[in-house]
Amino acid sequence: QSVEESGGRLVTPTPGLTLTCTVSGFSLSSYDMGWVRQAPGKGLEWIGIIYASGSTYYASWAKGRFTISKTSTTVDLKTSLPTEDTATYFCARQGTGLVHLAFVDVWGPGTLVTVS
């Protein structure tokens, strides 16, 4: 069971960058998936979650700045990319109905987004 992020790159501040998390070995219809980021020199910051049902929940600071969606095998994170969004972005499988990082059981390696 694994997840892997993609889509990170050097970009200018512009709407429309989408990061993709591809999962294998488990079904997104059975698990909740979160997105987390880590800016250079800072700690982990939880962005939001998409539940197995397809509904979403976001950290208060992330509302309106990020959109999480999914297909049968991918979980996407779309961001409008202000410069402070430079970070490594991770997707993670979370315990059902939980929004706490302590309950993550599968992490991806992350994808780096540099906004310049």
From Swiss-Prot:
PROSITE patterns assigned: IG_LIKE
PTM annotation (Pyrrolidone carboxylic acid): residues: Q1
Residue span, Ig-like domain: 1-107
Keywords per UniProt: Adaptive immunity, Immunity, Immunoglobulin, Pyrrolidone carboxylic acid
GO CC, any one term: extracellular region
Pfam family, one: V-set
Alphabetical GO biological process terms: adaptive immune response
Superkingdom of the organism of origin: Eukaryota
Remarks, miscellaneous: This gamma chain was obtained from antibody to type III pneumococci and was isolated from the serum of a single rabbit.
PANTHER family named among the record's database cross-references: IMMUNOGLOBULIN HEAVY CHAIN
Name under which the protein is recorded: Ig heavy chain V-A1 region BS-5
Upper taxonomic lineage: Eukaryota, Metazoa, Chordata, Craniata, Vertebrata
